């Protein structure tokens, strides 16, 4: 009897202990951990060529468009939506633009003009579909022999491309982004591509931008006013406005100004190819450059990194301010670039 009582008492304590442990376990499982209480921070997805928060697919394939910059082609359509614009001499003192679009898709782009070999090379750095209306002999050879993806208005005039009746040829060829997609589909070109991102500054790094204060600067491609480009830093907007002569560069459809965050002026060797004033430009050797960011000027070097023209200082890559970038390619930096403050303008 005594043994039975002892055994019963022991079993009772084992049962009570087990119940208590189970309740504590249930209580622990019911209570969320401190890490579960923390709000989950959603990582911001940024566009690879602007560094700004993405509003569309970041794997959208870039398109590169040669845009006319003759005075009769101004104002242009779609320049305000370009992530990057390269400006270079095409014939004589006339420049053209290579506009790279990835983060935004303008409804209308143009006037579209003929291809140049250096623009084709630059477009390859972004694995872009190349858009032009016409081509130089060397650009034609490159596009065809290298089997690059392109749409040329010579073959789509009146279909994918159209003529604006209010302007005269060759300053009146336009294409819509919708027709770019249509043409790409017809030719079996992919419209998606993993795009390697450019290097961008953080907010903290932007506050630490150093250099010489320069709120206005000029890049000249010729002696005439229409080839004199002025960049003016708007301190309220924190961005640059671009002028051709005294005329603000705006979008033809919306009249919105082209606003820029990085102005990169680079000196490259130019050589004439023919009697039309066509040139070849050395995109590969590197050289001197000037970088304008947030009202500051810095003398840098440039390098071609996988087909992209990027700034370097003391061998280290200089990052861009997030936003839109304009790259001026000039034959002689000292001759082309002017600090308006030094001139007293």
Regions found by a protein language model. Give the residues of each.
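Positively charged n-region of N-terminal signal peptides that target proteins for export
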Residues: 1-5
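Cross-family signature of deubiquitinases and ubiquitin-like deconjugating cysteine proteases
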Residues: 7-9
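Bacterial signal peptide processing site
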Residues: 20-23
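Long, intrinsically disordered low-complexity tracts enriched in Pro/Ser with mixed acidic/basic residues
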Residues: 26-29
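A surface/extracellular/periplasmic glyco- and lipid-processing/surface-interacting theme
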Residues: 35-40, 46-60, 67-81, 91-345
């Amino acid at each position: 009897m005594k043994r039975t009582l002892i055994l019963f008492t022991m079993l009772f304590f084992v049962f009570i202990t087990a119940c208590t442990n189970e309740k504590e376990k249930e209580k622990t499982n019911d209570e969320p951990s401190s890490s579960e209480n923390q709000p989950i921070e959603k990582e911001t997805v940024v566009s690879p060529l602007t560094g700004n928060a993405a509003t569309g697919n970041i794997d959208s394939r870039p398109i590169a468009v040669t845009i006319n910059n003759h005075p009769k082609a101004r104002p242009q359509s779609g320049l305000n939506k370009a992530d990057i614009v390269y400006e270079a001499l095409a014939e004589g003192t006339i420049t053209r633009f290579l506009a790279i679009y990835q983060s935004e898709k303008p409804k209308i782009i143009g006037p579209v003009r003929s291809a140049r070999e250096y623009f084709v090379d630059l477009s390859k750095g972004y694995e872009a579909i190349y858009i032009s209306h016409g081509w130089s002999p060397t650009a034609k050879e490159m596009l065809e022999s290298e089997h690059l993806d392109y749409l040329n208005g010579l073959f789509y005039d009146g279909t994918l491309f159209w003529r604006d009746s209010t302007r005269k040829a060759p300053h009146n060829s336009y294409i819509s982004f919708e027709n770019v997609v249509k043409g790409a589909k017809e030719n079996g070109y992919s419209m998606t591509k993993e795009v390697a991102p450019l290097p961008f500054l953080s907010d903290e790094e932007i506050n630490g931008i150093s250099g010489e204060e320069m709120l206005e600067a000029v890049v000249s491609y010729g002696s005439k006013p229409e080839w004199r480009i002025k960049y003016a830093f708007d301190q309220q907007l924190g961005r640059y406005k671009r002028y051709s002569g005294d005329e603000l560069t705006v979008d033809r459809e919306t009249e919105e100004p082209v606003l820029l965050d990085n102005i990169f002026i680079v000196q490259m060797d130019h050589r004439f190819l023919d009697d039309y004033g066509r040139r070849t430009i050395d995109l590969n050797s590197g050289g001197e450059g000037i970088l304008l960011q947030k009202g500051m000027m810095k003398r840098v070097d440039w390098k071609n990194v996988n087909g992209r023209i990027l700034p370097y200082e003391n061998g280290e890559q200089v990052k861009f301010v997030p936003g839109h970038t304009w790259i001026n390619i000039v034959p002689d930096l000292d001759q082309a670039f002017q600090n308006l403050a030094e001139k007293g303008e």
